[in-house]
C-alpha cells in the first residue's frame, strides 16, 4: 500500500520538483518578463478605457443596466452577478456608457494577469507572456474587454478558480483554505453565468483521475469547496422556485431542446466554423493543433491532464448541443482557457527553435489584432476605403441614443397637443431596453416600473414579464374609483392604465401595430417615423403609433 502511494504520483510529480530546482535561476528573467506583461496589460487597459464611450450601449448592456436598477436574487435568463457589477460601477460613475462598461477593461486586465501568473507557475514566464499576448489578440476577448456582458465576469472567475484549485492540489494540506476559496470563486462565476458550474466536473475529474489526489475525497477540502458553491446557488434556486423555474425553460429553448433532439451535422460545422472567426482563424487553428498534439500526453503529464479537464466538459457539452442546434461561439468560451494554455505549452518551445514558426506566430497575432480592431470599430475599414457590402455589425451599438432623442421629442410634442401624459410600449425587449436607458426623462409610472414596456402577453417571454406591467392589476384601495372605461376586472383589483393613451414603437416601416396591441386600444394611428442615418445609410428606423384609450384584454 505504501509502495503504491510512492509510485503513483511519480508520473506527474516531476514538474513540481523541477519548478523548485529552477526557481532561483529563473527569477531575474521572470522579473523582466513580468514587468513587460504588466506594462502590456496596462497599455491595453488604457486604450480600452478610452473606447468605452465611443459607441452606444448594445441592447444586452442596456437590458443588464435595467436589471441593475431592479436588483434581484436572479433574473429570467441569468444570475444576479452582472446586475450587481453594473450597479456598483454606475453608483460611482453614473448611468452612462462609461459607468455601465467600467468593469469590462478592469476584468480583462485582471483575467490577463491571472492567466499570466498561472501559466508562469506551470510553464515559466515566457509561456505566460505568449498566453497573454494570444489572449489579447483574440477578437472575442477584445470585444468583451470593452462591452459589458456576463462573459467578462464569467471568464475572470473561471480563470481565478482554475488557478486557486491548482494551488489547492499543489499545496494541500498545508494551505487548506484554497479549497473553500475555489468553491466560492466557482459559485460567484455561477452567479454570473450558469455555465461556470461545469468547473465542478473539472475539479472532480482531476481528483478522480490522478491516483495521488484521490485521497482528497477523504479530506474536508473538496467538501468545503462543494459546500461554498452550493451556498452560492441558493439565491437563483429560490428565485426560480418562486417564478415557475423559468430559467430552466429558457435554457431548454435556447438549445432548441423544447422541440426534441435531432441530428443536424451542418449545425456542428456552423458552430465550429464560427470559432475561426471570433477567435481569429490562425490563432484558433494553432489552438486546435496544439490541443490535438498534446492529447497523447494527457496521461503522462499532470499539468496537461489538469488543463484538458478544465476545457473538455464545457466544450463537449456545447459540441453535443450543436448537433441539435448550432450554439453561439461564446457559449463555450470558458473551455479555451485550459485548452489555450495547453496549446501555449505545445507551441512556445517549438516557436523559439524555428524562425518560420516565429514568423507564423507573429502573423497570427497581427491578424488577430487587426480583426479585433475591425470588430470594435468598423470605421477603420471606411478610412481604408473599403465599404461594407452588407449590414455593419457595429451598427448594433449605434443610433440608439439619437433615435431615443427623436422619440422623446415626439412624445413631448404630442403630450403638449393632447394635454396628457403618454406611456411607452416598444415592440421588443431590445428597443424597450435601449429606450429606457437613453430617455432623459425616464418618468416611470411607479416603483419597479420600466420607462418603456413591451406588449402585454400571458407568456413569460423575458425579464419584462416579471416587472410591473401596464396590463397589471393592483389592489383597489378603499375610496378609489374604477375608471369608467374599465371592462375586465379582477376582484379587489384595478388597472391604472385603463383609458390612457400610449406610444407604440416598432422597428421597420410596417403601417400597422400588432393585433394584440390593436385589440388593447380603441384606436391606433401612425404619427411619425424616426430614422437614424450614418454615412448616408439608414441604420435605424422606427415607426411610432399613437394608441388611444387603453382597455385590458380578456384573459
Enumerate the language-model features and the residues they cover:
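Luminal/periplasmic acceptor-recognition loop/helix of membrane-associated glycosyltransferases
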Residues: 2, 392-555
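Transmembrane-helix signature of polytopic, membrane-embedded enzymes
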Residues: 34-35, 115-137, 155-156
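Signature aromatic-anchored transmembrane alpha helix within multi-pass, membrane-resident enzymes
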Residues: 38, 349-383
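Transmembrane-helix motifs of polytopic, lipid-linked glycan transferases
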Residues: 38, 102-123, 160-164
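Short helix- or helix-capping micro-motifs
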Residues: 41, 131-139, 186, 190
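Membrane-interface transmembrane helices that cradle and orient dolichyl/undecaprenyl
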Residues: 120-126, 161-178
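Short acidic/glycine- and proline-prone juxtamembrane loop motifs at membrane-interface regions
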Residues: 140-154
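Transmembrane-lumen/periplasm boundary regions of multi-pass, lipid-linked membrane glycan transferases
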Residues: 188, 200-325
